[in-house]
Amino acid sequence: MEGVEGGPRGAGPPPARRGGARKVAWVLVDGLGDVGSPELGGRTPLQAAASPGLDALAAAGLSGLLDPVAPGIACGSDTAHLSLLGYEPRGLYRGRGAFESLGAGLRVDAGDIAFKCNFATLCEASGKITARRADRHFEAEGPVLCGALDDLRLPGFPDCRVRVRYATEHRCGVVVSGPGLSDQISGTDPLRDGLPLQVPRALDPADAAAEHTARVVAALSEQMTSVLKRHPINVERARQGKQLANVVLLRGCGGRLEVTPFRERHGLRACMVAPTKIIAGVGITLGIDVLDCPGATGDYRTNLTAKARAISAALAPGAPGDYDLGFLHVKAVDDAGHDGNLALKVNLLRAVGEMVRQLARLLWRHQQETGIEYVLCCTGDHSTPAAFGDHSHEPVPFTVAHLADVVRALGGEEALGCVSLEAVQMPPVDAPAAAAEAGGGRVPGAPVAGDAVGAFDEIAAAEGALGRFLGAGVVPLLKSFVLRP
């Protein structure tokens, strides 16, 4: 096969960029994939969701199965996004800390080390972490605690500067500046509840800089815990019987990557909506503009409609930035998988499908008014099966279609005009999985540009014309849709 190594079947090298090219709206659903569940009659959450919006997108275009990095790898969101955006993570990756910190708004310079961190609960008597996530709803308390930790002084290391910034939910970014630091160390996160807080160690004991850095980070962890356990917020949480946020788990130590910017690498001007800070940090690293989107929170309460409006506005002809590609990230589905909440994952996927219908309506308005054509794409960055509560290696469905074909699959312009642009209602966390709409949203047949797939799920996608391919093939495939006659 000619074209990108690991690319989809038939995806040859795209032609050179030309004027008047189409624009792409790319919806990335974090933790999209799953496995069949007995509670759902053997179906996956996507099959149970039977979303009219997602199924119409699949019916309108070309589908396949995507291994974001490579088959058999249960990848992290950061490595998956690097791969999907055309950057080989196995040759670049140096930890996720810089991504989280950049996304949170911290500056990361050459020589700095950065961490992706959790506010967590430490049992002081046993030294064990009883809860790696102190509280998912931490928007009020998190910034205050980060303020108490920012510019912390480390005894014995007067040349080191510590900066802390709140990210989302229970997360924060931490950057340490100082002479002779190395990112070749382990962190303090035991990765599972019920295990002891870890002591930072040099990955290579013969590496003097790493040994020095491990001592710095051990001092940092100790100082942070000392401040947090006395903080009035934790005094009040103890009084209320809540889990304490008395420790910061430091993980993913890394420095900032220096890479060829996305536009220079691919010839596309790109923007993204990504309230999840680690994804925003990946975008910043690659030179992708991260858009401000009020109401987009990166959790179960996010405003999906606000995201659709932001991407539509950014891709409007004549809009600032003159973007060719808008990347819309949805985090909540992944959280449901991590929380083991199968019904919530089903309901959230239906909400995402409704957002896709809204996005189609908003972009169709631009296309009708200006003649600029649009392409819609939807996929995930990895599977997060609710039964496992963590990332897994299963491939994820992928689909891409011309907007005009999506409109036909949704029932035509009249039906599209009936799609509400009111804010998509996010499902309650404890709601049961709602019954699928009559007919399941499947669209019989497919427009000319599509294949025989009529549903967006892990099983149907396996029959798609694109076959099974690697994340490295996504951007070249999208460029072929953008640039072909």
Placement of each model-derived feature along the sequence:
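Feature captures the catalytic ectodomains and active-site-proximal regions of enzymes
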Residues: 2-485
